[in-house]
Amino acid sequence: MPQRHPQPAHPADGVYFGLMSGTSMDGVDGVAVRFETGRAPVVLAEAFVGFAQSLRDALFALQQPGDDEIDRESVAANALVARYAVCCHELQRTAGLSRDDVRAIGVHGQTVRHRPERGYTRQLNNPALLAELTHVDVIADFRMRDVAAGGHGAPLAPAFHATVFGAPGDTRVVCNLGGISNITILPAEGSDVRGFDCGPANALIDAWATRQLGKPYDDGGKFAARGTVHAALLDALLDEPYFTAPPPKSTGRDLFSAAWLDAKLAGFAQVAPEDVQATLTALTAVSVAREIARHAAGCKAVFVCGGGARNPVLLDALRRALQEAGVLATVDTTAALGVPPQQVEALAFAWLAYRFTARLPGNLASVTGAAGERVLGALYPR
């Protein structure tokens, strides 16, 4: 059987909120979900609260070293948490909940540095302020406990994926196409669940759309659809050691930044903007497909979540890339498994809050490379 966490010995059943703002930095996804031992989680409400451009600019600026970072980081964290609180209040309103109905809020924060090789990962957050604004217990800082145990602190969602999406006798891959792409391999046989970051996804696709169109993202992949994949540029983009590094591994904007893209584009000034976009879309698809071919060649189904699930051009590119890599797998979204793709990441952090409350581990050492399974998170009481 695939590796799975046991059911809580001391149930912490109840309603939890999960908040996730990913590397696309466009806003926060939230869910209200009820967890009961031995039953599938039940989503009571979902919400999305966007970020103002001024906040997005501040968050993007913090991705790179700069002056007076401590002050800028603290001010941005407070503005970020104000949006988190709005999301929580919207979840309460939609689900008809009082604050006393909610056991805890699991909040990821906004990653501004991810350098586990140097012993840290930094998620911008102010959980104390969120507890004050919502009057609900807040559980945050999930990644550092895994890093402290020698792991990458990422990805953390595979433990949740194994609980919700695993099927005995059926090898599946769950692929999150957020700012960064990552996969979870749920094997049919009794081997461990595996998962890791594959490379850039919407982080570069969105950045190029913003630069060329003045829009925050490539709506439906229409910009990419106007172009043609430039083979030489794709080869240059794939000429990055991360793509062939063995797992466990994780990455982020620290590596796959606008500066990285500009350096790769330096010798391709003649390539039309729409062809660059088509090639960035292909980069995401090919990097994911090659990792699946290396580590889960026998999988029959790939289920996509994250913002990329709303990009049909990207999904078609993934289908083609899998076929070219020799992987005979269907590609669908997690909606086919009963979970809308935009909910998956927020659900994972609600689940991690549930695990913390039960004092049960939330990581998989087979995924992150940690010395063992650990209880993840820190509590900020209401």
Curated annotation (Swiss-Prot):
Reaction catalysed by this enzyme: 1,6-anhydro-N-acetyl-beta-muramate + ATP + H2O = N-acetyl-D-muramate 6-phosphate + ADP + H(+)
Statement: the UniProt record of this protein carries the keyword Kinase: yes
Molecular function (Gene Ontology), one example: ATP binding
Broad class of enzyme this protein falls into: transferase
Enzyme Commission number, as recorded: 2.7.1.170
KW DNA-binding (keyword) present: no
GO annotation (BP), single: peptidoglycan turnover
Pathway: Amino-sugar metabolism; 1,6-anhydro-N-acetylmuramate degradation; Cell wall biogenesis; peptidoglycan recycling
Keywords: ATP-binding, Carbohydrate metabolism, Kinase, Nucleotide-binding, Transferase
UniProt superkingdom: Bacteria
Coiled coil: none
Function: Catalyzes the specific phosphorylation of 1,6-anhydro-N-acetylmuramic acid (anhMurNAc) with the simultaneous cleavage of the 1,6-anhydro ring, generating MurNAc-6-P. Is required for the utilization of anhMurNAc either imported from the medium or derived from its own cell wall murein, and thus plays a role in cell wall recycling.
Similarity section: Belongs to the anhydro-N-acetylmuramic acid kinase family.
Classification via PANTHER family: ANHYDRO-N-ACETYLMURAMIC ACID KINASE (PTHR30605:SF0)
NCBIfam families assigned to the protein according to its UniProt record, in alphabetical order: PRK09585.1-3, PRK09585.1-4
Protein name in the entry: Anhydro-N-acetylmuramic acid kinase
Protein source organism: Burkholderia vietnamiensis (strain G4 / LMG 22486)
Gene: anmK
